[in-house]
Amino acid sequence: EDERRVGCLLHPLQNGGRDLRGVSFYGRELCDGHFCPSYHYISEVEKRSLIKILDSWYLYGLCVTDIDLVKEYFRLVSDGIGEMPPPGCFERPALRDAAGRFFSLKTTWPFRSSSVNRFGKYYFDGSQYMIRPIDYERLGVDKSVFDMIFLSLSSEFAGGEEVKEAEDIIRSLIDDFIRLYRREGGSFPVEEEMKTETGEHG
């Protein structure tokens, strides 16, 4: 009941001794000897926030392994409100739901590429993974300020109008959270673990 963080669901400890890590994108040997990049690059505050935002273990798994998506979201909302939202703020339903609508784009994004060899911003050419950039020049528009988010969502656009539509979706979700955060105001709960890490004592 106290275990809140999803671990590797392919690990033999989860499957009666069967090691299923060979079916992962990274392979068993890499998984066996390394932490996922998210372990190092997503901050403790961001991880705790994701745990509070996402009830679905599946969606949590998709998001916590997508470093760019997580970092960009919290950067954009932090720029808008002038501070990093504390994990405790997501105990308020309005803020949790607003953030959840953004991260649910991992499964609902209307501009997601139908290519089966895409994995977030990466595609597999048969021998290695590479990043497929969005050709904004071909689409007749400037590079989007949300480019990193678009790549994380495996975006593929038919034209410039779709890029603008996609930008409107992202901007609306970011602005919604900023507006709600300002409206909620006040102090938010500070978890005991966070107090210890930051040296705060009550």
What are these regions (language model features)?
Residues D2-R5, L10-G202:
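Short loop/turn segments that flank or connect secondary-structure elements
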